[in-house]
Amino acid sequence: MPQQQQQRRMFTAALLALVFILAAVSTTEAGKKEKPEKKAKKSDCGEWQWSVCVPTNGDCGLGTREGTRTGAECKQTTKTQKCKIPCNWKKQFGAECKYQFQAWGECDLNTALKTRTGNLKRALHNADCQKTVTISKPCGKLTKPKPQESKKKKKEGKKQEKMLD
């Protein structure tokens, strides 16, 4: 019997602890005030429009760009941002536009130029870039391949000269 009484006391204690925990949780939830949901404030501000990057020195490297936006209740309508123009980009297509170029084509004998095409890889800050561009450059020296026989004759001639000396 004493063992049954001990089990009843443990069960009663556990039950009281459970009731106490539930009461504590319900009072803390009741004490919280329901916060009214924040209204989603729609901004009257427009999207930022950025100028091209203007290098501080020269035509590449660190520089700044100006940003503007419109809106009646905008706190900020203009701002300046630091930017960088990589010095290895082809500036003739715009410093904001990066192209992936194919290999140089064959030399056009009529124009003495070879060309290659570049596809737009990246446009910084919504720059207006052409999708594809083409560049040309002079072919350089056009040399006719010399026949192998003449090289052999020259080598043989030099060998004979050394023997005579």
Swiss-Prot record:
Keyword tRNA-binding applies: no
GO CC field: extracellular region; extracellular space
Keyword line: Disulfide bond, Growth factor, Heparin-binding, Mitogen, Secreted, Signal
Any single GO BP term: skin development
Region Chondroitin sulfate binding: start-end pairs: 90-97, 121-129
Residue ranges, annotated region (Disordered): 137-165
Signal peptide: 1-30
Family statement drawn from the similarity comment of this UniProt entry: Belongs to the pleiotrophin family.
Functional note: Secreted growth factor that mediates its signal through cell-surface proteoglycan and non-proteoglycan receptors. Binds cell-surface proteoglycan receptor via their chondroitin sulfate (CS) groups. Thereby regulates many processes like cell proliferation, cell survival, cell growth, cell differentiation and cell migration.
Protein name: Pleiotrophin
